[in-house]
């Protein structure tokens, strides 16, 4: 049984699919820049959901869009003296690199807004015909007050809202709108903007209508699960519901799941606070992709994730232990490839081990089935990794170390189970790096020496210290001009 917290009902519900194939739609990125830690948090969570559904014998169709036309993309294109298409294409390629590095399965379909303009226009026309939309001088708006159920996802009070076409809070009313709460379905093109032809003239779609049209085209009127960050509950997902249910006359999604935001040292991650972390920067700084993935899964997807040096270091050490266990076959140099057919193991012992491991698999499924309790699932992973790591400690220290047949059977079965369950979490073996023996006091001393060198503009010496520490397996992370942290790699 799988239970999920449904933002729509505000409670945990037993998951019941509509039919044989679970239909999932996830709001994708606006492709104007590299992905950040918040994106990693979101897409890792939904990757675990998808993997767990497949592990639980569900067939899944997973769709995630690209928003490839938007004010931010147009602004970036202008800054780079390039085109909207060039900016989008470049960042879609970089998106795939980041997601692949984190072990995130590629969606079954990744529609782009610009490829669905005809569907979007048809969708808007339906809303117009039904009286939910109106046009004003080339712009088209959704009339929020026509929809009595508006606000059911976010519990927003229409009387307290004052939102503009993008759904952002403002103080002044747009004179074209019947009400300030109405939002844009189609935007009239400005002189210097790319545009698409439509029944209302040249322009481009609003953000919210893109997803409604793509959900319908890719998955139908009603889907099982709609995913996104908690920052999308309002206005984006609220507006999606308003559009889709008005046009189709059916419920858009049975389950709405939203992940929590990322904080950096207790503060919300944002560009303005200069604590913004891209996935690329984090990995380049020496944090392995699987350490990052493990770190994200230590906290339930709905809760805020606090990115701190201490939490990251703890995750790095924990993942290192699991990674050693996943490297069991490599480290034992083929000694555990199989058990010879002539070697006899008591059936009672086999049954005992099989039962114990089946109980662990059951607890693992119960944890993930309880609203994706990844921390609980990781506890089972750690339990499986422990005997493998303990054995390796002996095996590598004692030359000619031998192992009894029963223990060999236990370790092999334990390893197979570990491999299977880590795959459900998307954790994959990484190349082991010999650990540095340098002490923390020496690291701190060298960091202070490097900071002093930088203040004196002796950058050659600063680089020399960085390289020295790197040779010893220590990667420095410059948080600011005055603050440098480190991790073992």
Curated annotation (Swiss-Prot):
The keyword Nucleus does not apply. GO terms for cellular component: cytosol. Its EC number is 6.1.1.16. ATP binds at residue 271. Binds 1 zinc ion per subunit. The gene is cysS. Keywords: Aminoacyl-tRNA synthetase, ATP-binding, Cytoplasm, Ligase, Metal-binding, Nucleotide-binding, Protein biosynthesis, Zinc. Its cofactor is Zn(2+). It comes from Prochlorococcus marinus (strain AS9601). A motif ('KMSKS' region) lies at residues 268-272. InterPro entries: Cys-tRNA-ligase (IPR015803), Cys-tRNA-synt_Ia_DALR (IPR015273), Cys-tRNA/MSH_ligase (IPR024909), Rossmann-like_a/b/a_fold (IPR014729), tRNA-synt_1_cat_dom (IPR032678), tRNAsynth_Ia_anticodon-bd (IPR009080). GO terms for biological process: cysteinyl-tRNA aminoacylation. A motif ('HIGH' region) lies at residues 29-39. This is Cysteine--tRNA ligase. PANTHER family: CYSTEINE--TRNA LIGASE, CYTOPLASMIC (PTHR10890:SF3), CYSTEINYL-TRNA SYNTHETASE (PTHR10890). NCBIfam families: cysS. Belongs to the class-I aminoacyl-tRNA synthetase family. One of its GO terms (molecular function) is ATP binding. The keyword Transcription does not apply.
């Amino acid at each position: 049984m799988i239970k999920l917290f449904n933002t729509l009902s505000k409670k945990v519900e037993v998951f019941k699919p509509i039919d044989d194939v679970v239909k999932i739609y996830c709001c994708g990125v606006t492709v104007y820049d590299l992905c950040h830690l918040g994106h990693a948090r979101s897409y890792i969570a939904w990757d675990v959901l998808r993997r767990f559904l497949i592990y639980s014998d569900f067939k899944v169709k997973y769709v995630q869009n690209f928003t490839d036309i938007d004010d931010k993309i147009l602004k970036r294109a202008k800054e780079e003296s390039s085109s909207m298409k060039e900016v989008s294409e470049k960042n879609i390629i970089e998106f795939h690199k980041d997601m692949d590095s984190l072990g995130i399965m590629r969606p079954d379909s990744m529609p782009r807004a610009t490829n669905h303009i005809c569907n979007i226009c048809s969708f808007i026309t339906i809303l117009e015909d039904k009286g939910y939309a109106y046009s004003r001088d080339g712009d088209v708006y959704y009339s929020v007050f026509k929809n009595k159920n508006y606000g059911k996802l976010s519990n927003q009070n229409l009387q307290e809202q004052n939102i503009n076409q993008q759904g952002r809070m403002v103080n002044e009313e747009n004179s074209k709108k019947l009400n300030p709460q109405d939002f844009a379905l189609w935007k009239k093109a400005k002189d210097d903007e790319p545009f698409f032809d439509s029944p209302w003239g040249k322009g481009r779609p609003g953000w919210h209508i893109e997803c409604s049209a793509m959900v319908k085209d890719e998955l139908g009127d009603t889907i099982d699960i709609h995913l996104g960050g908690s920052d999308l509950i309002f206005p984006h997902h609220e507006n999606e519901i308003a559009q889709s249910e008005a046009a189709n006359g059916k419920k858009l999604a049975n389950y709405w799941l939203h992940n929590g935001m990322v904080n950096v040292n207790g503060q919300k991650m944002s560009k303005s606070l200069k604590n913004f972390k891209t996935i690329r920067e984090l990995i380049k700084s020496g944090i392995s992709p699987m350490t990052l993935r493990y770190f994200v899964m230590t906290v339930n997807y709905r809760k805020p994730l606090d990115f701190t040096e201490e939490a990251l270091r703890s995750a790095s050490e924990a993942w290192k232990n699991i990674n050693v266990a996943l490297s069991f076959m490599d480290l034992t140099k083929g000694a555990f490839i199989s058990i010879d057919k002539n070697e006899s193991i008591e059936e009672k012992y086999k049954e005992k081990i099989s039962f114990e491991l089946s109980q662990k698999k059951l607890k693992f499924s119960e944890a993930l089935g309880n609203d994706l309790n990844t921390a609980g699932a990781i506890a089972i992973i750690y339990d499986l990794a422990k005997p493998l790591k303990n054995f390796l400690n002996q095996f590598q220290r004692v030359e000619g170390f031998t192992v009894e047949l029963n223990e060999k059977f236990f370790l092999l079965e334990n390893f197979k189970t570990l491999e299977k369950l880590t795959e459900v979490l998307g954790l994959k073996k990484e190349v082991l790096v010999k650990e540095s023996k340098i002490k923390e006091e020496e690291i701190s001393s060298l960091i202070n020496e490097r900071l002093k060198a930088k203040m004196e503009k002796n950058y050659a010496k600063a680089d020399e210290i960085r390289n020295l520490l790197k040779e010893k397996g220590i990667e420095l992370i410059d948080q600011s001009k005055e603050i440098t942290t480190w991790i073992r790699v």
